[in-house]
């Protein structure tokens, strides 16, 4: 709070050990993670002032995202695109705030993000959830448009399953989450060496990112969580086996 917010309310991405600002970015992911931290602190400590701060910052995030020109566009106007990342993280962010404090905007945001994932990012023709699509969800046949990020997709299935649990295991949400999880596991699991790899191309071309075949820790841990949620939702032994498979691999390597 003391060192990481600029005068415009946007967070710095990087500061020195003394709090001197070094870098700002065009995203609001730092704000989302700050909101989650404030919410969890409020729940753990009982200090409701942090729940109120979390809600206020969440509303600020929404204002940043809806104010034309406040956040620098990733692409020039020739490319009108939507990104999966912010759509997905807002589900979890709103969910964590809701656990600390009530406000109708939280349910509204979750519903809007869920609808956007279903409408724009799920592409059955590739059996994949894509990271970047056109403004109306159309497939963009470029290196970036073909990217599948199995970790992000599995994380999304976790968030949707968590919301399904909140809604007494809503069947439609469970169905959507399991579809994403099953597809993403198929794309991401390394059948030879185990673990979830970073990136795939939905047309099976070589993925552009240099780290495409690496296995960072976070896709593994999110797969551990998502598969356990899937088992809780369905009691299907398949998901328990997947949970054991990714858990064994993760704890053996990290």
Specify the residue positions occupied by each region the protein language model found:
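Glycan-recognition and catalytic cores of secretory/periplasmic carbohydrate-active enzymes
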Residues: 1-254
